[in-house]
Design a protein with these regions (language model features):
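Structured helix-beta-strand junction loops
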Residues: 34-36, 68-71, 90, 107, ...
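Short, well-structured N-terminal submotif of metal-dependent ribonuclease cores
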Residues: 1-40, 54-63
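Short secondary-structure boundary segments
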Residues: 43-44, 97, 115-117
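Active-site neighborhoods of divalent-metal-dependent phosphate/nucleic-acid chemistry enzymes
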Residues: 73-110
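Short, well-structured alpha-helical segments
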Residues: 62-66, 81-82
Length: 134
């Protein structure tokens, strides 16, 4: 297992909805909770998880994101915005994903993400919890 990860929204959303790959995400969350892996999350990622999961039940999603923020150390957008902007300028990538990438770079961590190809060709170590989208 990696020493440090910066988690993207896709794994957390998959875990919330028990999608394919949720078991792998659970293992990572467990490793972070037990202190075996240093976990980082950006505030932009928290925002994405909250609004996507909140489409079904806003209060449950709020509680879930609150727990996530207890599991992972939070990096603010302010901390990495310039690095995120440079990444967005150089690559065709979703705005939320650049904040995961910038957080991984800032914290010398592996970007933990899903199957989307936004992370391809970026100068950051990537680990995927699944190879196919849902």
């Amino acid at each position: 297992m990696d020493e440090a990860i910066a988690i993207d929204a896709e794994p957390l959303i998959a875990y919330y909805w028990d999608e394919p790959g949720a078991d792998a995400v659970e293992g990572v969350i467990d490793a972070v909770e037990r202190g075996h892996v240093q976990g980082w999350i950006n505030t932009v990622t928290c925002t994405e998880v909250r609004y996507v999961c909140g489409r079904d039940d806003p209060e449950t999603a709020r509680q879930y994101v609150s727990r996530i923020r207890n599991w992972f150390d939070v990096v603010t957008a302010e901390t990495v915005w310039e690095r995120a902007a440079a990444c967005k300028q150089a690559h065709r990538i979703a705005l939320g994903d650049v904040f995961t990438i910038a957080t991984a770079m800032e914290k010398d961590a592996v970007a933990y993400c899903g199957a989307d190809d936004d992370f391809n060709g970026i100068d950051v170590d990537v680990r995927r919890f699944r190879d196919d989208g849902v």
